[in-house]
Amino acid sequence: MNKNKREKEFYSVDVGDSTFTVLKRYQNLRPIGSGAQGIVCSAYDHNLERNVAIKKLSRPFQNQTHAKRAYRELVLMKCVNHKNIIGLLNVFTPQKTLEEFQDVYLVMELMDANLCQVIQMELDHERLSYLLYQMLCGTKHLHSAGIIHRDLKPSNIVVKSDCTLKILDFGLARTAATGLLMTPYVVTRYYRAPEVILGMGYQANVDVWSVGCIMAEMVRGSVLFPGSDHIDQWNKVIEQLGTPSQEFMMKLNQSVRTYVENRPRYTGYSFEKLFPDVLFPADSEHNKLKASQARDLLSKMLVIDASKRISVDEALQHPYINVWYDPAEVEAPPPLIIDKQLDEREHTVEEWKELIFKEVLDWEERMKNGVIRGQPSPIGAAVINGSPQPSSSSSINDVSSMSTEPTVASDTDSSLEASAGPLSCCR
């Protein structure tokens, strides 16, 4: 494509404190979120005739870390296609050559709210269970390709008014190609698993701990382990769950074990005391979902010793979750990750830049030739043992509405603006 023709396809518009240079098919840009990795705005796509979210990556070539993260996010989003993971609709850059290349734009599905907002609402058992089921389905799909998310948190999970849930932001994900033990990585502290806090390395069920923390927050309406720093986070965990056994201590390296063993010992609290019945909605007559089942699931996910913690597969079979079980959703074909050494690769900024530019051009070429994967279909009427899933028209527990802007969560826990539009899956 010649320079003049390409330039005519784009226009520039100020969005907040940033300038977006986007394809003319995208109109009515409006800021909805920002964070360390990018700025997100909503827009109307005249080609698809739908609202979308456009994320402009923030200074992707500032240094090797930023460049590698941008490459990882783009590659993983291109590979993954599941109804519970945010769909990538388009990728583009206004620059026409590698020498000029500096901006990357990702176009994604637009959702109604993130889980931070849902946590402030009252949920009946059907909705709580169904949201968790989708969270686990999306996580399992990533795990099936050896991808560990590592950064699951309420602001990285988005929902629509019909209770559709999707996981997003893969810049912190990594592949598990080199073995079981992996290095610690800074994720949002409150949802960080003990094995990460203690530098033990981790396996796939590190994400299960995060799901457990999120579930606990949905039940309690507040963060379960609100640590003020790395050490305080561990203290908050053992104060509530109790000091782990000597068997667990022996798995720690010597310096960490010495520190942990010298901390005050806590007996912890029973899950009945941590999550009393009063925190839960009334038991569901519709499908027999009960507070006791939800509490049992929490007790299996929030286990300090990862070797004794429930797996994603086991969580999906739990009575509180498996009422929604659909093999087509749970056993969806794993994404094909072509670059098996995605996280082990090291390059200069210029090399990462060239790799990203090639990925963008590849997407543009496939779009031009019509060779682009279909997007995840709406959840529609999933069934619960033959009964329809909770929908926006459900009368269960007199659904009321919450006002939120349509939004895609940013990679921080802030910058989401509220205003109109019901989130009617919650009451």
Swiss-Prot record:
Q: What class of enzyme is it?
A: transferase
Residues annotated for ATP binding in this entry: 33-40, 55
BP GO terms, sorted? positive regulation of NLRP3 inflammasome complex assembly; rhythmic process
Highest rank taxon of the organism: Eukaryota
SUPFAM superfamilies linked to this entry: Protein kinase-like (PK-like)
**Sorted alphabetically, which Pfam families does this protein's record hold?**
Pkinase
Membrane-traversing stretches: none
Query: What PTM annotation applies here?
Result: Dually phosphorylated on Thr-183 and Tyr-185, which activates the enzyme.
For the modification Phosphotyrosine, which residues carry it?
185
Q: How is its activity regulated?
A: Activated by threonine and tyrosine phosphorylation.
Q: Tell me which tissues or organs this protein is expressed in.
A: Expressed at high levels in the ovary and at lower levels in brain, gill, heart, spleen, liver, kidney, muscle, bladder and gut.
Obligatory cofactor(s):
Mg(2+)
Compositional bias, Low complexity, is annotated for 387-403
- Transport keyword on record: no
User: Start and end of every Protein kinase domain?
Assistant: 26-321
Chain intervals with Polar residues compositional bias: 404-417
Q: Which reaction does it catalyse?
A: L-seryl-[protein] + ATP = O-phospho-L-seryl-[protein] + ADP + H(+); L-threonyl-[protein] + ATP = O-phospho-L-threonyl-[protein] + ADP + H(+)
Catalytic center residues = 151 (proton acceptor)
Q: Which UniProt keywords apply?
A: ATP-binding, Biological rhythms, Kinase, Nucleotide-binding, Phosphoprotein, Serine/threonine-protein kinase, Transferase
Q: Where is this motif: TXY?
A: 183-185
By sequence similarity, the record places it as follows: Belongs to the protein kinase superfamily. CMGC Ser/Thr protein kinase family. MAP kinase subfamily.
* Free-text comment about domains: The TXY motif contains the threonine and tyrosine residues whose phosphorylation activates the MAP kinases.
Give the protein's function.
Responds to activation by environmental stress and pro-inflammatory cytokines by phosphorylating a number of transcription factors, primarily components of AP-1 such as c-Jun and ATF2 and thus regulates AP-1 transcriptional activity. May play a role in the regulation of the circadian clock.
The protein's name is Mitogen-activated protein kinase 8B
* Species assigned in the record: Cyprinus carpio (Common carp)
